Amino acid sequence: MQKKILEYLKRLEEVEVEISNPEIFNNPKEYSLLSKEHARLSELKNTYDRVMAQEKVLSDDKQALAQEKDPEMIAMLEEGIQSGKAEVEKLYKILENLLVPPDPDDDLNVIMELRAGTGGDEAALFVGDCVRMYHLYASAKGWKYEVLSASESDIGGYKEYVMGISGTGVKRLLQYEAGTHRVQRVPETETQGRVHTSAITVAVLPEPAEDDEEVFIDEKDLKIDTFRASGAGGQHVNVTDSAVRITHLPTGVVVTCQDERSQHKNKAKAMRILKARIRDAEIQRRHKEASAMRSAQVGSGDRSERIRTYNFSQNRVTDHRIGLTLYSLDKVMEGDLDTITSALVSHAYHQLLQNGNEENS
């Protein structure tokens, strides 16, 4: 770890020289990248300085304890040493996270797609519950939340729901929500009080930046159909052909949007989803080819992987990837997801750091 820290501190000095060059302002994109790197490395240096200072205090307290005779002073020093050890441990965890090179996608916004799976109506209702959960979480984080597409079920809830979430740290915290979410509870229609199990799938697609050169879509590769929007049960809710279906012919990816009354707005939303899906498909393909990259993730990120179980009768939520169980499902469903998302991020960073150390050893 010490070797990595020294490498980053040297890089910080280089970045400070580069960013102080007046010519850097002629290249806004480069300046933006350097500014972000400078902020990250500065945080690392500040944390490292705090670790060194705390370890010095700890060392001094231990030396004083070895020579102290007064019982009250001994008790005070022992208490200080215990709290000092806890603080050093906490700072080292922060330092570990900062030592992991950032994912270039960390600053991207995301498109989340929730779909009802096994369980029929109950699964659709749980999609609705999770939509609300993510909406509340986004609000608590100060993120922008946007409905891109929604297909309601006949009894409430959604067969499919697509949302856009934007803000600082969105992708970093939400990326591990991808997978199968299983719910165990007694449906309102159940007269015998039996617990039913159903499931939904969640996809988290980083939304390509406007200047992303990797995602190029040629207009001639698109088949665009327009039709009248319909609501639950199939009834038409608009008398104009405002709904849009876009098919990307080379990949076969199909996106439908019908929530806006404007055909133009529906097309714009459909294109955003299409770009994100095409980009995600390419990333999934690369990950399958690079098994080393796969093993560094928390779980596979596969849509079919069961990642979490929500047991309502026990007020329990379990994340199977890291063995985390909380008996506060009621709070989680109200958008209190920080304990889960932070634990997943920390676990993933620790894995990446370990893999990096193994490669360098």
Curated annotation (Swiss-Prot):
Q: Which GO terms describe its molecular function?
A: translation release factor activity, codon specific
Q: Which residues carry this modification: N5-methylglutamine?
A: Q235
The record's listing under Pfam families reads: PCRF (PF03462), RF-1 (PF00472)
* Role this protein plays: Peptide chain release factor 1 directs the termination of translation in response to the peptide chain termination codons UAG and UAA.
- Tell me the protein family, please: Belongs to the prokaryotic/mitochondrial release factor family.
Keywords for the protein's UniProt record, in alphabetical order: Cytoplasm, Methylation, Protein biosynthesis
Q: What is this protein called?
A: Peptide chain release factor 1
Q: Which PROSITE patterns is this protein grouped with?
A: RF_PROK_I
InterPro entries associated with the record = PCRF (IPR005139), Pep_chain_release_fac_I (IPR000352), Pep_chain_release_fac_I_sf (IPR045853), Prokaryotic/Mito_RF (IPR050057), RF-1 (IPR004373)
Entry comment on modification after translation: Methylated by PrmC. Methylation increases the termination efficiency of RF1.
Q: Name one GO cellular component term.
A: cytoplasm
**Localization (cell):** Cytoplasm
- What gene is this protein a product of? prfA
The organism sits in which domain of life?
Bacteria
> Is Metal-binding there in the keyword field?
no
